[in-house]
Amino acid sequence: MDHILALVLALLPLSLCVALPGALDAMDVEKMKSKVTWKAQGLVARIDKHFPDRGLRFDTDKVEGSTSVVASLESYNNLISDRFGGVSQIKTEISSLAGYLNHWREGNCQEQQPKVWPRRNIFNHTVSLEALMRVREFLKLLQKNVDLLERC
């Protein structure tokens, strides 16, 4: 037992000097949060411009970490029909934000790929409009909870 304790104590200084793979640099995290907030604000403004708020409230997914955010954004983007008017730029920006977060997540998280909801081919306009409203609410929630992106 004494040998194990001595070995642990001898290796402790070495383990403190070696950086953990995937250890988060505070500057990188703050830069990521700032960029996500900026992109989310732009997306909310663009959605509001093309699809004004009609006072309806939609339930949104929870912001639980970067993996859940990527999955939600990609899923909402899949639900928005390409044929729905005025959404091509919005879809591009959602894809850009999801791609940015996914790239950051791959470099800083050890988790699996996020699971994306399947695309639906019925009631395209209704599903697209609801997905747009939900992604708007989700982005507002994301801006308030941007600190949770540090989690995987």
From Swiss-Prot:
Protein origin, superkingdom: Eukaryota
Keywords: Disulfide bond, Obesity, Secreted, Signal
First and last residue of the signal peptide: 1-26
GO cellular component labels: extracellular region
Disulfide bridge map: C109-C152
Location in the cell: Secreted
Tissue note: Expressed mostly in the liver.
Primary location recorded for the protein, binned into one broad class: secreted
Functional note: May function as part of a signaling pathway that acts to regulate the size of the body fat depot.
Similarity section: Belongs to the leptin family.
Protein name: Leptin
